[in-house]
Structures are given as structure tokens and as C-alpha cells.
């Protein structure tokens, strides 16, 4: 029976686009207390929990490599998919996204993402941020009107008729769409599409912001970055003198420096002590992030050395999500809320991400080095060994990018 089921792809870009949605509830769902709408903190907490869980899986599967992804893009795409899920398939997706279904209703989760999209799309002259979803649908496939409407209203999804029988043309159509929405940062989200594909869901996010205090390119010089005990590479190292939030975590053996964008969003650089990366990764939790944010205090850093980098990644997440408990969508899925029949199964979950950090700021579509030197009141921070980075939006506390930079010289 499984061999007869129809291919369905879930694509996760590293960008997002314009959202203008109005309040809408799924039919036949009564919210007992309308005031119990999911607030941004509740949504951010679940999304952060999911972000760190997914990070740990990706880091485990990609040892000694750069890791970069957009947890918000992945979670939003899966929440979008859950609109059409029923029964145990629905429960598995939402619990896999770290929602406690004894405390929160499905309707509230969708409302939470709806309001998050609205918040992310507020116009700003200090930040380029676009967020969106899209469906590419086999031309003769009949989707339920309710799914189409919920997708449009709650997730601002566009829909495009597509001829998947010409799989190469369909692949080009989708890849070009994502490339356009991500300002060229994600050039080839799909390497391959099966002719049996009938539906592709895409989520994309684009983020570009300038540092509040910019690095001077004239001071950027080649310097050593210690990838491991046995490997050192030369990278462009930026330097800056500034006052910025800083915290030395003696308990976890790491140092944190937060750099703020002109939009007041921020990038948090987490620098483990030598030999402490794996220990630190194991202890990444929402509670740890909250403690760090509460502990950051403005400090004068006379010399901050930070490598320029441009990292792109592409992940197939089927096995990773299965290990995180989201299994049924790939095997015996009940996605009857999409077409009215239970003949759809997700064949591939693909996520592409790109993040650039330079003297101007950040752009993303997705050994011996972290030394602190003190001479009286003079603080010098050298980021010249593997480190973690989290890009966080201030108003929603959403982690839009999370990753590990092991080798800045590798794209």
C-alpha cells in the first residue's frame, strides 16, 4: 500500500516574505478562552526548545563541520504542514515542535504563527526581513477549500499550479522562486524532484541588517583561525573597539558577546573554552539561553576580533526529524486535511540556509582562540576557534539563525 502513496515534499528555505493576514479560526473549533492566545513568549520558548534539539542532531550528523540553519523556517513549515494533518500524525508534528498539547490547543498554535508572521513583516527602514510560504500544486490535484483558505489566512501562503511530470521544469520553477525570494542567497534548494511529486510546500526567510557599531574594513586583516589542534586556516579577521553586552559563564566554560544591529535585533556569539564545545552543545536549552540573556551586561571591549564568514548549507531532514519523533509524515501519514484522502506522504524535507557576517552586518537567507586578555581594565576578545552563533529578533525573541562556525574559510 505504501508504494502507491503519492510523493509530497516539504521545503524549508532560509528566508520569508510579505505577510498580511486577518484573524481566522479553523472550522468546528471552539476556543474556550479567546484570551488564551499564544503569546510571543510561549511560542518563542517552544521554538527555542525545537531549535536546540534540531541543532544537536545536525551537529551530531556533521562532526567538525559548519552547521547553519533557520529553526524558525523549519518550525513554521512543519506547523504549516500540520494544517492538513489528522490524528496521530498531527499530534506527532506538534509534539515534535515541542508544544505541550495538554496546555495549548492546535488552533492557538496556528494563531501564534499567524501573529508572529504579522510581527515579522512590520515595515522597518533599519532591517530587511521577509517571510513567507508557498505551495506548488500538481495541476489536476484538488486541494480542500478549507486547507487552501487556512493556508492563505494563517500562513499567508501563495499557491502555484505546477506540472511535476516534467520534474526538471518543476524543479527549476521552485528553485527560481526561492532564489528570487531570498535575494539569490539560496540558489538551488532542490537538487532533484521525483515525477511522482504532487505537492511542494516552501517556507523562506530573508534577513539583512547592519551592525549598530560597524567594523572598519581598513582594520580587517588576515589572521589565524584554529579549526582544531591539528588544523589552522587564514581568515579575514575584523576588529572593533566598542561597549557591548558580555558574559563569562564559568559554569559552562564559555564566553558570550552580543552584537546589536541598528534594528536592535542581535547576534549572540558563544565561545566555548578549549575542549568544551561538546559539553556546551549538550547543555543548550531554552533555560540556558534565558540565563545567558539575563546575565549579559554592557562591557567595554577594547579589541574584539571576529572572523568574516559566508556559510551555505543544505540538509535533507527526513532522518533527523524521525529521530526527533516526527516519523509518520514519511510512512503512514494521515494528511487527509489537504485533499480529503489519506494518499499523501512526505517524501523529502529539504532545508537550505545561508549566512554572511561582515563589517557591515549580517545577511542570511538561514584551539586556542577564544582568549580573553586583561591588562588592567583592557579587555581583548579573540574569536579564533570554533564558536556558536544565534541571530535573535528582539520583539519576538525568535531565533532565525542558529549554527556553529567550525571553519570560516569554508563556504
From Swiss-Prot:
Its main location: cytoplasm. One of its GO terms (cellular component) is chromaffin granule. This is Serpin A3-5. Glycans are attached at residues 100, 180, 230, 264, 318. The record marks 377-378 as: Reactive bond. Homodimer. Keywords: Cytoplasmic vesicle, Glycoprotein, Protease inhibitor, Secreted, Serine protease inhibitor, Signal. It is found in: Cytoplasmic vesicle, Secretory vesicle, Chromaffin granule; Secreted. It comes from the Eukaryota. Belongs to the serpin family. The keyword Ribonucleoprotein does not apply. Serine protease inhibitor. Pfam families: Serpin. GO terms for molecular function: serine-type endopeptidase inhibitor activity. SMART domains: SERPIN. Residues 1-24 form the signal peptide. The keyword Secreted applies.
Amino acid at each position: 500500500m505504501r508504494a502507491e502513496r503519492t510523493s509530497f515534499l516539504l521545503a524549508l528555505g532560509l528566508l520569508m516574505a510579505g505577510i498580511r493576514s486577518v484573524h481566522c479560526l479553523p472550522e468546528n473549533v471552539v476556543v474556550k478562552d479567546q484570551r488564551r492566545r499564544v503569546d510571543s513568549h510561549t511560542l518563542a520558548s517552544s521554538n527555542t526548545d525545537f531549535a536546540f534539539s534540531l541543532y544537536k542532531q545536525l551537529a551530531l550528523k556533521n562532526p567538525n563541520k559548519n552547521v547553519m540553519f533557520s529553526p524558525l523556517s523549519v518550525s513554521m513549515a512543519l506547523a504549516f504542514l500540520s494544517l492538513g494533518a489528522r490524528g496521530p500524525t498531527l499530534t506527532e508534528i506538534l509534539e515534535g515542535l515541542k508544544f505541550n498539547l495538554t496546555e495549548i490547543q492546535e488552533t492557538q498554535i496556528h494563531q501564534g504563527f499567524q501573529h508572529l508572521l504579522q510581527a515579522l513583516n512590520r515595515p522597518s527602514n533599519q532591517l530587511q526581513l521577509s517571510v513567507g510560504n508557498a505551495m506548488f500544486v500538481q495541476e489536476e490535484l484538488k486541494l480542500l477549500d478549507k486547507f487552501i483558505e487556512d493556508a492563505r489566512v494563517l500562513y499567508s501562503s501563495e499557491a502555484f499550479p505546477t506540472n511535476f511530470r516534467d520534474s526538471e521544469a518543476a524543479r527549476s520553477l521552485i528553485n527560481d522562486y526561492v532564489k528570487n525570494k531570498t535575494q539569490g542567497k539560496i540558489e538551488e534548494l532542490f537538487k532533484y524532484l521525483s515525477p511522482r511529486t504532487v505537492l511542494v510546500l516552501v517556507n523562506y526567510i530573508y534577513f539583512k541588517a547592519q551592525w549598530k557599531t560597524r567594523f572598519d574594513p581598513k582594520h580587517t586583516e588576515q589572521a589565524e583561525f584554529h579549526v582544531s589542534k591539528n588544523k589552522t586556516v587564514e581568515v579575514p579577521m575584523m576588529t572593533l573597539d566598542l561597549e557591548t553586552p558580555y558574559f563569562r559563564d564559568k559554569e559552562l566554560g564559555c564566553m558570550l558577546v552580543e552584537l546589536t544591529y541598528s534594528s536592535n535585533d542581535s547576534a549572540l556569539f558563544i565561545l566555548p573554552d578549549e575542549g568544551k564545545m561538546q559539553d556546551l552543545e549538550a547543555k543548550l536549552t531554552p533555560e540556558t539561553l534565558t540565563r545567558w540573556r539575563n546575565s549579559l551586561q554592557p562591557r567595554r571591549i577594547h579589541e574584539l576580533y571576529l572572523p568574516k564568514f559566508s556559510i551555505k548549507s543544505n540538509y535533507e531532514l527526513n532522518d533527523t526529524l524521525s529521530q526527533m519523533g516526527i516519523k509518520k509524515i514519511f510512512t503512514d501519514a494521515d494528511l487527509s486535511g489537504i485533499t480529503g484522502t489519506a494518499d499523501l506522504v512526505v517524501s523529502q524535507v529539504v532545508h537550505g540556509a545561508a549566512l554572511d557576517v561582515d563589517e557591515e552586518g549580517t545577511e542570511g537567507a538561514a584551539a586556542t582562540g577564544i582568549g580573553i586578555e586583561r591588562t588592567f581594565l583592557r579587555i581583548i576578545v579573540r574569536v579564533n576557534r570554533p564558536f556558536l552563533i544565534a541571530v535573535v529578533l528582539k520583539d519576538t525573541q525568535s531565533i532565525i539563525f542558529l549554527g556553529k562556525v567550525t571553519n570560516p574559510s569554508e563556504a
